Amino acid sequence: MPKKRKTRGKKHSAKQKEEEVNSVVSPGIAKNDEGAGNDEGAYQVNRYTNEPVQPFFGALDPEEEKYFQQAEQAFANHFTRENEDTRFFVDSIYREVQGKELIVCNNVFGSKVLEKLFPLSTSRQIKSFFSALNGHYVELIQTTFGSYAFEKLLSHMAAILNLETQGVTEDQDDVLEGENENVFMTAETLLMYMYNEIRPEVSMLMSHKLAVHVLGKIFLLLDGYRFVYHDGNRTTMESISVPESFPQFAYSIIDSATDNLDTPELRAYCVDKYASQIMRAFIRIDFERSKKTKKKHDPRLVSKLLLSNEYDLKELPFMETLLKDETGSRILEVIVENMSASHLLRFYAVFEGRFYRLCVHPIANFIMQRYIRRLGRKEIGSVIDELKKNTDNIIRKSFLPVLRTLLEKSNHLHCYQDDIFSMIQTSVTNSGKDANIIPCLLRSKHKRDKANPENKERKLVNNLLGAQLLEEMLHCEKQHIQLLLDSVLDLSKEQILEYCLETVSSHLIEGILDLSDLNPVFLKKFLNILSGSFATLAVSAPGSHIVDKAWKATRALPLYRTRIVRELAEGGDDVKFDFYGKKVCSNWKVELFRRAPDEWYRFMKQDEPSKRVHERARQYGRIVSGSSANTQPLGEKRSTENDEELESGPKRVKV
């Protein structure tokens, strides 16, 4: 047998090292040989991209794919509401999908069509489609497009389950030709089929990149929570009614994880990028279970992780990991939000002396917000006393959300508002920039529009966190609100117009105009500043809301209302035919003012308050009682007794 040829050099030595490394495959990457990935309870991983290998269900024909591409465009352009045409279109799509549900779910165009199809479907159609996936739930949630389509389907199945649990009968819809017989099953039965199929694979799916998003929502559905999807990828979670067997199923999985996994393994899951989402669901469900029991005790899972009395939280390294880790901090947020009040003092011992450093930390500040919402009056005072020592940098960008939460809690408890305002004013004064509190907190800057690089004009950009803090200041006492109003009047007209036309800062102006007891002197000065610019504001998205708020704010100022509506009428077609301007014209009845001003004045009179302007001014000390003959409200009649006293002669009696 010939000897193996010897080789040397950097090229061959590097190749030899690579072969040695490949011979020892890491646990997260499947070895690429025969039988790799065929073990039960494991999924295949691409050795080159380190991404999970997705199951393959088949592919659509070019004609079928073109059909779903056209169906997606039809949904966007025409079939957006419930009507007869939409019903026929939905039924035709279900006939096309029948028999190839898995393939359509995992297609880029088919999944988008399904996401728009489910909200317009009947309960029978939803259950028929869901039952067609039976036996393939585990594989489907491991695919890119199928996982998103299944999330939407699960949300609609939860809505059907809620109705069936409450005893609401579904409409007797016509069964489509060839429709699955499982449509006559209840949503509870169909969902239990899915749970029983997924349960043996939970440990494998917890670390799957695509499956964890669906798996977390599945566990929360067991506990009675449904995710509602809105436009713009926004989701909200609402409580629903579920059968009694659902929470017990979730409790059994959590108890199994608590008993079979030791503490280091559970903590490793908490800081894992994907498994932490499932751990958050487990912790939330475990807290819900403990609240339902008569004997209040800490959940077993959370006690094993962190809250056991055996642990010294101040010296526990895992506590520091949760505070500073981007993934683990979300776990700690759920714990702080739901833990019993007896643990607040233990956490206070951990945070004492570190409040400022944790509040300005880019990750720990989210935990501090949750913690501050749980504190009482005494603890809030201790936090503020510690923060007073660092008032120079208290308006830092990373500190603004904590400052807003602190002010919100102070408004709720009606305490320490003066201290917070004094800290903010001191920090603004020491910043060395503009002494006005509004531009300082908004961190106003002029930047070029990235969406339109050719446009060299710079647009105003404001900080959202600072705007939220300023909006929270509007819920404080009158003397604090007056400081904010004075800061608005100190701005130039150009600055105020820029703030009105910018999306973030316009909400602050709306909040000011929406105040129930707004100072009439400030309102007149502010409207005088905006005079001549209402037509410009009406044709912009942020400014149109401000013009609409001005209608309510000027209820007691008919002269200012007339000026504004006249200015809108003089705007002509530029305002009338603009997308936002026509809505403003409709709210202000501009067309009625053009055609029949007398009728518009009568319409305005109907909206006038019973309390007159000078009565509101008297509340602010502007008019002294008895200093003028006009202090008497116009709506009241003179007293007859006073008239009799003023008469010089006796009454004439008719005989």
From Swiss-Prot:
GO terms for molecular function: RNA binding. Pfam families: PUF_NOP9 (PF22493). One of its GO terms (biological process) is endonucleolytic cleavage in 5'-ETS of tricistronic rRNA transcript (SSU-rRNA, 5.8S rRNA, LSU-rRNA). Keywords: Nucleus, Repeat, Ribosome biogenesis, rRNA processing. It is found in: Nucleus, Nucleolus. One of its GO terms (cellular component) is 90S preribosome. Pumilio repeats lie at residues 96-131, 132-170, 260-303, 314-348, 349-385, 490-528, 529-566. Residues 1-14 have a biased composition (Basic residues). RNA-binding nucleolar protein required for pre-rRNA processing. Involved in production of 18S rRNA and assembly of small ribosomal subunit. PANTHER family: NUCLEOLAR PROTEIN 9. Belongs to the NOP9 family. This is Nucleolar protein 9. It comes from Schizosaccharomyces pombe (strain 972 / ATCC 24843) (Fission yeast). The gene is nop9.
